[in-house]
């Protein structure tokens, strides 16, 4: 969720908003980029951060970075009052059921659009296309987001700890394209060591299986 938009926008990303993600995983990866100046982490449950700091220190290790500002509040309410502020918004949410359901609505995506700068990008977890229930949730999220942004593309990753292991993520913008605007030379020059991501994989991740394309076409 982090390296894909960074490899596209590069040093244009100065200010980032993460909604959810209280474990600190996204923040840890963001903090590896020295040009990022400010990271707001909006987490509704203070206990999530406290527990992860204690029991998952390898994930939560950057939550005390001076660039990171943790706001314990509802992301739905927070985003409503923000306009033209962030270069990148990452929605590291739970599934679209119960408390997390509001983070998949058209209203929420519209507010994210408003909160981004002109060149800004929204990245969100988009559920799995594999099992029927998850696939329906994926469709609903995609329907809502394509009505909120001029450009929306999905990319996939293999995550064995998630149901089916096949998971989708969204990349949405006013026109920035995740493949055509990729800057592999810049990203590779950073010399970041990653376990999964590389710029060749980046391009391939946006080429989706036929059954996923058909699923998404029904709501586009």
Locate predicted features.
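Acidic/polar loop patches that form or flank catalytic/metal-binding clefts of enzymes
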Residues: 124, 149-155, 179-182
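Conserved beta-strand signature within the Rossmann-like core of class I S-adenosyl-L-methionine
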Residues: 119-126
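Generic structural signal for helix capping and beta-alpha/helix-loop junctions
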Residues: 132, 161-162
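Histidine- and/or cysteine-centered catalytic micro-motif in compact active-site loops
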Residues: 94, 126-129, 157
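The AdoMet/dcAdoMet-binding core of the Class I SAM-like
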Residues: 1-119, 131-138, 216
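SAM/dcSAM-binding transferase cores
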Residues: 164-220
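Conserved Class I S-adenosyl-L-methionine
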Residues: 109-110, 135-158, 170
